[in-house]
Amino acid sequence: MVLCFPLLLLVLVLWGQVCPLHAIPKHLTKAHWFEIQHIRPSPLQCNRAMSGINNYTQHCKPQNTFLHDSFQNVAAVCDLLSITCKNGWHNCHQSLKPVNMTDCRLTSGKYPQCRYSAAAQYKLFIVACDPPQKSDPPYKLVPVHLDSIL
């Protein structure tokens, strides 16, 4: 019995590496998944917008921020000076101007009945950018992660 616990722990750790909680859906590129999660040109109702994201992940995402701008404008931030990301990588870029955004926070419910509150904001943002994958728009770099809101 004592041997079983370490073995179970090892299996769980390895499973987490294979199937991370925030895995990108297989048929999407990192940039497309970023667009689905974080780009909405106009203000939105959080319950409706988050249901689209939660349907991919099959759980209630605790928090999410939607930038009210175009993918093209957010991708243009990737052309600005690189800065250090929260994870220590150097592929982040900060917007020069604040944008309107909506912060959605889980207030109650279990998937698929997730309920969110909404907070309108006007702030700067930092995105992580990578070279595009084959089916991404043909920019030099594309946003793949919303690293921070300032």
UniProtKB/Swiss-Prot annotation:
Q: Which UniProt keywords apply?
A: Antibiotic, Antimicrobial, Disulfide bond, Endonuclease, Glycoprotein, Hydrolase, Lysosome, Nuclease, Secreted, Signal
Q: Which gene encodes it?
A: RNASE6
Family under the similarity heading? Belongs to the pancreatic ribonuclease family.
* One MF annotation (Gene Ontology) recorded for this entry: nucleic acid binding
Cysteine-cysteine disulfides: 46-104, 60-114, 78-129, 85-92
Mention any Pfam family matching this sequence: RnaseA
Q: Per the UniProt entry, what are the Gene Ontology biological process annotations, in alphabetical order?
A: antibacterial humoral response; antimicrobial humoral immune response mediated by antimicrobial peptide; defense response to Gram-negative bacterium; defense response to Gram-positive bacterium; innate immune response
Q: Which residue positions hold the site described Critical for catalytic activity?
A: 61
- Organism of provenance: Aotus trivirgatus
Query: What protein is this chain from?
Result: Ribonuclease K6
